């Protein structure tokens, strides 16, 4: 499998399309390009048990997000608010942008 080719970026709005959190919508917190995975806000939550230490007398159970493979995520277009596939194209001025294949609009952040 080809690695390092992902269409997701940090702060993108995505929907989980497969797995235990199917249908959940969240923001991408981190993209792991080398593993083709992304961490999505409040999706794929796991529990980690921490041992008691001298500084932290009690052990505890910590819930945190685990990475999800990018094939199980679909980007939500900010223009048409639908989930869909994303393409990449080069504009006339030479800049590369991602675009929604259903409405044709750019999905890049307006900053």
UniProtKB/Swiss-Prot annotation:
GO terms for cellular component: ribonucleoprotein complex; ribosome. CDD domains: KOW_RPL26. The keyword Ribonucleoprotein applies. GO terms for biological process: translation. The keyword Ribosomal protein applies. It comes from the Bacteria. It holds the Pfam family KOW. One of its GO terms (molecular function) is rRNA binding. Part of the 50S ribosomal subunit. Belongs to the universal ribosomal protein uL24 family. One of two assembly initiator proteins, it binds directly to the 5'-end of the 23S rRNA, where it nucleates assembly of the 50S subunit. This is Large ribosomal subunit protein uL24. It comes from Desulfotalea psychrophila (strain LSv54 / DSM 12343).
């Amino acid at each position: 499998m080809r690695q390092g080719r992902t269409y997701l970026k940090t702060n993108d709005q995505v929907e989980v399309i497969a797995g235990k959190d199917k249908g959940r919508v969240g923001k991408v917190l981190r993209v792991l390009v080398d593993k083709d995975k992304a961490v999505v806000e409040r999706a794929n939550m796991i529990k980690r048990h921490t041992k008691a230490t001298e500084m932290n007398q009690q052990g505890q159970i910590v819930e945190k997000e685990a990475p999800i493979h990018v094939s199980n995520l679909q980007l939500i277009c900010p223009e048409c608010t639908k989930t869909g596939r994303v393409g990449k194209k080069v504009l006339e001025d030479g800049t590369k942008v991602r675009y929604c294949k259903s409405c044709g609009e750019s999905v890049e952040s307006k900053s």
